[in-house]
Amino acid sequence: MNNYIKALLIIICFSSCSISDKNKYNLDVLEATHLNKNILNRNYVGMTRQQIVYIFGIPIISDSFDDIYHYYLSDSKNNNVYPKKMLNLYFKDNKVFKFNMT
């Protein structure tokens, strides 16, 4: 009888893990809530390409001739997607020298 109770508790514990699966984290989309022009200008201007890829990941579009990386930003709350933004990082001498968000 004691073994049945232990088995039942183990099953309940493992099945409760699937409840937390509703709030998935999407790694493919950067959240724009934490990025504004002051933060970008203060922290990311002057960084190298390798540092940007380490922080933001591989860009969705990279113009090899124009030295521009494009990142897709989205705000989401309660499964509602709010206006989407594009973060464009411009490189000069392998360092970020300007950016814009559209």
UniProtKB/Swiss-Prot annotation:
Top-level division of the source organism's lineage: Bacteria
Signal peptide positions on this chain: 1-20
One GO term (biological process): Gram-negative-bacterium-type cell outer membrane assembly
Family annotation (Pfam families): BamE (PF04355)
Family membership noted in the UniProt record: Belongs to the BamE family.
Quaternary assembly: Part of the Bam complex.
Name of this chain's protein: Outer membrane protein assembly factor BamE
Keyword Membrane: yes
Free-text function comment from the UniProt entry: Part of the outer membrane protein assembly complex, which is involved in assembly and insertion of beta-barrel proteins into the outer membrane.
Entry's localization field: Cell outer membrane
